[in-house]
Amino acid sequence: MELFAYGSLIFNRVMYAVTGSRYDGRPARLPDHARYLVQGATYPGLIPSVGSTVEGVLYSGLGNRAFRLLDRFEGEHYRRSSVAVDAGNGVVIEADTFIFKDDYQHLLTDELWDSGTFESAHLTAFLDEYSGFTWIDT
C-alpha cells in the first residue's frame, strides 16, 4: 500500500521512529489540498483546498502493521483517506493520507506549514518527544 506523507512523516527519521521500518520515498504532490500548522504544535493538518497543492513524499510497500502504527501516531484528529497523488511525469497514484477531521479544523492556524522550518527548528525535539513510539504492540 502507498502513503502520501506531507508533514513530519516526510522525514525518513520520523517514518522510521513510527513504523520501525525504512521505506523509499519519492517526491509527490497532492492537488486541491493545503496544510496548516496546528495550534500549539509544530506539525500540520491537511485539509481540502481547491487550487492549492501540497508537496510531500510518496512511500510504497507499507503493510497493515505499518498503517496500524501510523493510525495510532496520527491520533483522533486525523482520518485516513484515499487520495489521487501526482507522482510526476503524468503518473497519478492512489495513496492513503491523513486528513484533519472537520470537527477539529478550528484547531488549525492560518499559517501554512513549512517543511524547512520544521526540519531546522523542530525535527530534533519532535523525534525526542516521539522516541519509543514503535514499542506499541499492534
Regions found by a protein language model. Give the residues of each.
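Glycine-aromatic micro-motifs
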Residues: 1-138
